[in-house]
Amino acid sequence: MTSPDPAPPRPRVHVLTLRPDGAREDTARRVGAVLAEAFATDPYTLGLVPEDRRGPRLERKFTAAVRQGLRAGADGAPLGAVDVAVDAADGTLLGAAVWTSPAAPRGVDVPGLLAGLPTAVAVHGRHTLALKRIQAACERARPAGRHWYLEEVGTVPSARGRGAASALVRHGQRRASGLPVHLEASVPATVPFYERLGFRATGHVPVPGGEPLTCLRWEA
């Protein structure tokens, strides 16, 4: 009696943090493209990005998010972080996470808003105003105290089931060093995933014409 050979173990996932002073523009674009692929079927994202040239729009959107995560303050302190999950065997990018650090300014950043407006309009078109309203509501839902904010986390479809997303979130939890972590889940089905990582739901942000965002918080 014979049995089929067991499937070979899948290569491990490593998580790396990009250095703001060492991340080149092509790196930002590569990571942005990975996130664009990860969110290519996300209902919330697609509801705010016109169908025309949607692929390039998504890549521009997430490349801008990566650049934002790599920025530093006037004193050189990082205002965010960008982590990437890679296949330990061949270095293939599997996913990424973009974070805002406790050092980032809160409230309305008028210069930043104006600087980012051309990209927002190019990506979101007629949905730009709706997006800004949702973002303002998300800002109001964030904790008042110091915390890390998980802006984006996603993995490419071929990497799902390998633990890359969990590894990315856990990496950020360790970096938080006892501070809370806050995020919004755009799809209700992903809430249990975050709950398994220790998050708890704290409220919702309404999305006109779509599912509300679920606010979640993790505390050490």
Regions found by a protein language model. Give the residues of each.
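Conserved acyl-donor/pantetheine-binding loop and adjacent beta-alpha core of acyl/acetyltransferases
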Residues: 96-154, 160, 208, 212
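Conserved active-site alpha-helix within GNAT-family acetyltransferase domains
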Residues: 166, 178, 187-204, 208-211
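Conserved GNAT acetyl-CoA-binding A-motif
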Residues: 146-148, 175-186
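Conserved beta-strand-loop-alpha-helix junction that forms the acyl-donor binding cleft
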Residues: 151-160, 182-192, 208-209, 219
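Conserved acetyl-CoA-binding loop-helix of GNAT-fold acetyltransferases
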Residues: 152-157, 161-174, 196
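A short helix-loop-beta-strand connector motif used in the catalytic cores of GNAT acetyltransferases and
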Residues: 60-84, 143-146
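Conserved N-terminal entry element of GNAT/NAT acetyltransferase domains
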Residues: 1-29, 33, 37
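Conserved beta-hairpin
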Residues: 76-97, 154
